[in-house]
């Protein structure tokens, strides 16, 4: 990792601290130290490597991110996965690319510092990590407040960080049989954000 900026130096320092503290743990996830490890990752801004500084992030280039993950994984592959997933797919990346300003302000700073741990619900028993495959479906309906909502029936498997996640990005194929969506909005594959404790 190049040490030509204070940001990169901070990342290097945080990375070395994480390796020193947890690199020797054989099963960091979902072992008994998981909450301590997640706190350490968040405090050292290692969840924020794809998030702009404007939202509390520590964004670096793809090459630099690859270097971070290579170094971490060479010490402990499980730790590498715990840092890789939030920095590569799921709520953080999707909010950065597609979220509106309100959503970015609500979630990105909390994802950056580890206040929210994300996961991405895509893989199911009949599909791998393929957003265009046989993924779960949702149906547009109007709730009791006459607001457009999505009723989803899900069956997910093998979701990294799911047992400890606070925010899930749920990939679903949305259908609109009653034509409730505005004419300029098309049904199809989308991602819903659900916080832990979301009512069924």
Task: Pin down the residues of each PLM region.
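A short core secondary-structure module
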Residues: 147-200
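Beta-sandwich/jelly-roll carbohydrate-recognition scaffolds of carbohydrate-active enzymes
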Residues: 106-110, 120-141, 157, 177-184
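A generic structural signal for well-ordered coil/turn residues at beta-strand boundaries
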Residues: 41, 116, 132-134, 146, ...
């Amino acid at each position: 990792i190049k040490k030509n900026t204070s940001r990169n130096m901070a990342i290097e320092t945080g990375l070395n601290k994480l390796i020193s503290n947890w690199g020797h743990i054989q099963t960091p996830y979902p072992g008994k130290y998981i909450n301590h490890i997640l706190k350490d990752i968040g405090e050292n801004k290692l969840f924020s490597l794809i998030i702009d500084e404007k939202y509390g992030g520590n964004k670096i280039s793809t090459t630099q991110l690859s270097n971070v993950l290579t170094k971490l994984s060479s010490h402990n592959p499980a730790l590498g996965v715990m840092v890789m997933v939030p920095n590569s797919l799921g709520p953080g990346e999707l909010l950065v690319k597609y979220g509106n300003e309100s959503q970015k302000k609500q979630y990105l700073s909390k994802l950056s510092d580890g206040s929210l741990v994300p996961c991405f619900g895509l893989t199911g028993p009949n599909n791998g990590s393929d957003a265009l495959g046989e993924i779960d479906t949702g149906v547009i309906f109007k709730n009791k407040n006459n607001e457009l909502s999505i009723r989803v029936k899900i069956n997910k498997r093998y979701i990294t960080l799911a047992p400890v996640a606070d925010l899930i990005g749920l990939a679903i194929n949305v259908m609109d049989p009653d034509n409730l969506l505005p004419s300029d909005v098309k049904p199809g594959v989308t991602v819903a954000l659900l916080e832990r404790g979301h009512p069924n």
